[in-house]
């Protein structure tokens, strides 16, 4: 009886520890190809980041959303893995995901963006990093 109780307590404790590990961490989203919110966030992050890069003349644009992970905080962190390329739109113009298409000769880069959206729906790019082309 004592060993059965100890086993139940041990297994229960392991389940609680596993739950605590998941809570607060990033969770992968399997519907990232179908959810327009993720594409909107990808374009927001890419255009915001590229507009801030010194010496850059054209916006980058999203070629493909490869992976999406979310983390619930006081709002939501979205970690997106993207394929991006330089677009046909100059930085002096206004970025539009519909008109700023990837330049046919541009190299594609894989980038990871973290976008924070607070409870009021305001967004900011926390980080944006690309692998060397």
UniProtKB/Swiss-Prot annotation:
Checking InterPro entries in the record gives:
Cystatin_dom (IPR000010), Cystatin_sf (IPR046350), Prot_inh_cystat_CS (IPR018073)
Tell me which CDD domains the record gives.
CY
Q: What induces it?
A: Blood feeding does not affect expression levels.
> Which ranges carry the Cystatin domain?
34-118
Which Pfam families does the record match to this protein? Answer: Cystatin (PF00031)
- The signal peptide here is 1-18
Q: Where in the cell is it found?
A: Secreted
Q: Report keywords, A-Z.
A: Protease inhibitor, Secreted, Signal, Thiol protease inhibitor
Q: What does this protein do?
A: Inhibitor of cysteine proteinases. Inhibits host cathepsin L (CTSL) and S (CTSS). Modulates production of various cytokines and chemokines in lipopolysaccharide (LPS)-stimulated mouse dendritic cell. Suppresses maturation of mouse bone-marrow-derived dendritic cells (BMDCs). (Microbial infection) Modulates Borrelia miyamotoi-stimulated immune responses in mice by suppressing activities of host dendritic and T-cells.
Q: What is this protein called?
A: Salivary cystatin-L2
């Amino acid at each position: 009886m004592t060993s059965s109780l100890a086993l139940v307590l041990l297994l229960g404790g392991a389940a609680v520890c596993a739950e605590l590990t998941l809570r607060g961490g990033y969770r992968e989203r399997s519907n990232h190809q179908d959810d327009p919110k993720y594409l909107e966030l990808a374009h927001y992050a890419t255009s915001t980041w590229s507009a801030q890069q010194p010496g850059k003349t054209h916006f980058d644009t999203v070629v493909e959303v490869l992976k999406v992970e979310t983390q619930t905080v006081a709002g939501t962190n979205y970690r997106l893995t993207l394929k991006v390329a330089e677009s046909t739109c100059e930085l002096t113009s206004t970025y539009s995901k519909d008109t700023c298409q990837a330049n046919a000769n541009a190299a594609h880069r894989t980038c990871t963006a973290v976008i924070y959206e607070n409870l009021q729906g305001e967004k900011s790019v926390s980080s944006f990093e690309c692998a060397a082309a």
